[in-house]
UniProtKB/Swiss-Prot annotation:
Gene (UniProt): nifA
Keyword terms of this UniProt record: Activator, ATP-binding, DNA-binding, Nitrogen fixation, Nucleotide-binding, Transcription, Transcription regulation, Two-component regulatory system
Location of the region described as C-terminal DNA-binding domain in the Swiss-Prot/TrEMBL record: 480-522
Region spans: A domain: 1-184
Domain Sigma-54 factor interaction: 211-439
Name of the protein: Nif-specific regulatory protein
Source organism of this protein record: Azotobacter vinelandii
Length: 522
């Protein structure tokens, strides 16, 4: 718990501060996805604030329902005496700066601590001539369940609003973690909720946990996601129905600088054109029968974030022209209105159609096609990546098992049958098959016979071409991809894979466990 004050320049450029904050957010997101106790996670988040941004002596207080007050959940200090003294400190609603944040649910910013009589200085930790920021941590219902506070390492300056907004974003990230602590105090089961939190955080900030696959085609998809996520360019996701195009769009958003802004979805094929226009652009009061008040459309809802337009190939030529204008100029009018609305939205579109062919036939505007197709990502159908089916089956059964509250396993013979099927409905069909198999299984074990009852048969698809050998020294591979590639080259023999990676058998066994790699039987 080293709280040595970091050295940094007194005057900070806004762009530098913004870059530092983005890096810190990424670090905090990774921290919250780790398999650790909640108090350790909180302390590590406070360490990031202290070391990377000069937000010193961070403090997280958590609602204590038994006493109707806030108790200290974590504090960043190198003083063991201060840490021990904090154990009994509580703040009642309205008491001190922390209690005021709890009572009113608003952030409090002090330009100089000594100038504000509300500051109680119970911890004797903060410089009274320096600023202090405290922000609320709220649950989804909007109730304050904790407070995040820290002291900037410089006197009040023009960056105080930016620092405050940043702490509010961090407080939002911490909200679920703090909510778990409150639930534990209420006597709820902690382990399942902690696991759920980790899944949610990983789902948002690690696409490897959203999109499963280790074959070369999927590794190329992952590499494309990493590259394009850093840019604001429009992305066109191509693939058959059921391949997971929305998951790819979500992964792009949550790996991008827009991750803390909205991710809004719309299926263009689900609405008639008249409703589609209102849904995307919004409408003014009285624009049509039933429009009793003004309503923002999906573009406005996604302002600053990402708008995912699924089934983009289904929109009419007339509507294509309206969409093109928004992509070109970033502006539109609500239905029934004449006031121009400007938005900053990244578009990720998806289709199962061959848009290039549609352009040649005159069914899709060429200029819109090129606006959408700045970067195209093709998702391979499941029949082209059957080697991913064992890992996919494990992943999907884990998801189904959590939803149904029962453990599920699958036998090797069932996996072989699943790998022999052509899966015209792709991953969606596989998930449906596994859920039906789970329902029909007596003890949660999915056997070949159970899978056969769902209608899946051995179709013996043509053998895929041999997979090209992966360069284990490739720096674009992450740890999980590198270990899987080594295992594939070693025929899934751990000792042989360890030699390829320059590891001991114990080290690779630890990596396999911590990286959640499902070993294939040979």
């Amino acid at each position: 718990m080293n709280a040595t004050i970091p050295q940094r320049s007194a005057k900070q450029n806004p762009v530098e501060l913004y870059d530092l904050q983005l890096q810190a957010l990424a670090s905090i997101a990774r921290t919250l996805s780790r398999e650790q106790q909640i108090d350790e996670l909180l302390e590590q988040v406070l360490a990031v604030l202290h070391n990377d941004l000069g937000l010193l002596h961070g403090l997280v207080t958590i609602s204590d329902p038994e006493h109707g007050a806030l108790q200290i959940g974590a504090i960043h200090t190198d003083s063991e005496a201060v840490a021990q003294a904090c154990e009994g400190v509580r703040y009642r609603s309205g008491e001190g700066v922390i209690g005021n944040v709890l009572k009113h649910g608003n952030s409090v910013v002090l330009g100089r601590i000594s100038a504000d009589p509300r500051f109680l200085d119970r911890l004797a930790l903060y410089d009274l001539e320096m600023p202090f920021i405290a922000v609320p941590i709220k649950n989804p219902e909007g109730n304050t369940i904790g407070v995040l506070a820290a002291q900037p390492d410089c006197r009040a300056d023009e960056h105080m609003p930016a620092r405050t907004r940043f702490l509010e974003i961090v407080a939002n990230l911490l909200a679920q973690t703090v909510r778990l602590v409150v639930n534990i105090e209420d006597g709820r089961e902690a382990a399942d909720e902690r696991d759920e939190l980790r899944r949610e955080v990983r789902g948002k900030y690690g696409f490897e946990n959203m999109v499963v696959g280790h074959t070369p085609t999927m590794r190329r998809v992952f590499d494309q996601i990493r590259r394009v996520a850093k840019w604001n360019s429009t992305v066109l996701v191509l693939g058959e129905s059921g391949t997971g195009k929305e998951l790819i769009a979500s992964a792009i958003h949550y790996k991008s600088p827009r991750a803390h802004r909205p991710f809004v979805r719309l299926n263009c094929a689900a609405l008639p054109e008249t409703l589609l226009e209102s849904e995307l652009f919004g409408h003014e009061k009285g624009a049509f029968t039933g429009a009793v008040k003004q309503r923002k459309g999906r573009f406005e809802q996604a302002d600053g974030g990402t708008l995912f337009l699924d089934e983009i190939g289904e929109i009419s030529p007339m509507f294509q022209a309206k969409l093109l204008r928004v992509l070109q100029e970033g502006e539109f009018e609500r239905v029934g209105g004449n006031q121009t609305v400007r938005v900053n939205v990244r578009i990720v579109a998806a289709t199962n159609r061959d848009l290039e062919s549609e352009v040649e036939k005159g069914k899709f505007r060429e200029d819109l096609y090129y606006r959408l197709n700045v970067m195209a990502i093709r998702i391979p159908p499941l029949r082209e990546r059957t080697a991913d089916i064992p890992e996919l089956a494990e992943f999907l059964l884990g998801k189904i098992g959590r939803q149904q509250g029962r453990p599920l396993t699958v036998t090797d013979s069932a996996i072989r049958l699943l790998m022999s099927h052509r899966w015209p409905g792709n991953v969606r069909e596989l998930e449906n098959c596994l859920e039906r198999s789970a329902i029909m299984s007596e003890d949660g074990t999915i056997t070949r016979d159970v899978v056969s009852l769902t209608g899946v048969d051995n179709e013996s698809p043509p053998l895929a071409a041999p997979l090209p050998e992966v360069n284990l020294a490739d720096e674009t591979l992450d740890d999980r991809e590198r270990v899987i590639a080594a295992l594939e080259q070693a025929g899934w023999v751990q000792a042989k894979a360890a030699r390829l990676l320059g590891m001991t058998p114990r080290q690779i066994a630890y990596r396999i466990q911590t990286l959640n790699i499902h070993m294939r039987k040979i």
